Amino acid sequence: MDKSEMDKINGTNPESTDQAPSLASRPDEFEEEESLVTPDALSARIGGFQIYAGSVNWGVFGSMKIVFLKSKLNVLIPCGFLAIFLNYMTQRYGWVFPLSMLGIIPLAERLGFATDWQISCEVGRLLNSAFGNATELIISIHALSRGKLHVVQQCLLGSILSNLLLVLGSAFFSGGLACGKTMQTFSKADAVVNSGLLLMAVMGLLIPAALHYTHSEAQFGKSELALSRFSSCIMLVAYASYLYFQLSNNRRRNEANVYPCMPLIKRRIQDDVDGNDDEVPEISKREAISWIAIFIAWISMLSYYLVDAIDGASKAWNIPVAFISVVLLPVVGNSAGHANAVMFAVKDKLDISLGVAIGSSIQISMFGIPFCVVMGWMMGKPMDLNFHLFETASLLTTVLVVAFLLQDGTSNCVKGLMLFLCYLIVAASFYVHADPNSKASEKPPQN
């Protein structure tokens, strides 16, 4: 019996003898390649092809369960209903105001959750840009419609100060403690661009204030308002250009990384293969849009009672309206962002923390404030960029401190503590600040 016949009896193929050792010599690679192409292996690796459909609760009750039961902050939702009840039954604004604040906090967090789904990277970033500070804008628009122009200015100013000092300081301090590093690093180039945008916003607010306090207006009472409206349009164009630049930059990076902006199911499979632990959206696109509309309407309703109770709460608590507007109101919109910034800093993802804190400040200063000026223009309200001397000085010093601390691209506990202490100084200054413009800001409409 010759050798070929013996090979047939033993079940071996003489032609495959050259390939067999190569496969046997690297069994791990062979198994890995097989797992990438075999449906059963791929199914076992990501939990089956039904992971996407199973992770998205398409039913109404499943969506409600996710939205209302997955956040511990939702225990505060009944506070909103209690605030409405007290407003109509007792009109005790000292209680209506804090209950309205507590009722809005979980709604703001859930609004952020509803905008978290992403069909593509660009859509996700645009949604976050549009709704990242929706709560502050809704409160500001309600105050604007009531003619409380200085409350609008101070609320938006307080949001910027809170993000730059309190949120960023907490992120730096917590990240330095948790990571056990002498220094944490972040993108110096992004920090420089962000600092430049913040300084541009300060310039937009500083010049109208200087025009007012130097009494150098060509037409008293009109030049300041006209300059504010013109500058607001310029700032909106600058912010739109910044968004376009950011999205274009990210698109180029995504193309270089091959797959980060692929459709969700493909990205989920690839990320699972690469070991990334990205979460699949828990609600569908249609459900997310519906919840966004519901939460905006709900926040808008509670904001009506919140704004209406500011003066009453100021008298009941014997604290200045400026302190309520600058320190307390920003807590409503910044609470969820504050927690996220600290969480990412603890995980040593400081660039994301800066995106939350400084990105929110840029959006308020370059979009929120100019948007309110334009909205006031449309409503016939003389909303301008003259935030008055004390408020503008507070913003200028804050931006300068933050810009200096960011210029080297590193952070530590000491920097975080410095920012936090600076916020305490600012908060105390508004507590003792007797606002001479609170009544002057209720100006008659001008055309």
Swiss-Prot record:
Protein name: Putative vacuolar cation/proton exchanger 4
Protein purpose: Vacuolar cation/proton exchanger (CAX). Translocates Ca(2+) and other metal ions into vacuoles using the proton gradient formed by H(+)-ATPase and H(+)-pyrophosphatase.
Family the entry assigns: Belongs to the Ca(2+):cation antiporter (CaCA) (TC 2.A.19) family. Cation/proton exchanger (CAX) subfamily.
Topology in the lipid bilayer: Multi-pass membrane protein
Chief location category: membrane
Cytoplasmic side of membrane: 1-65, 115-122, 181-190, 246-286, 340-353, 406-413
Subcellular location: Vacuole membrane
Disulfide bond sites: none
Residue ranges that the Swiss-Prot or TrEMBL entry lists as coiled coil: none
Organism of origin: Oryza sativa subsp. japonica (Rice)
Bias (Polar residues) ranges: 10-22
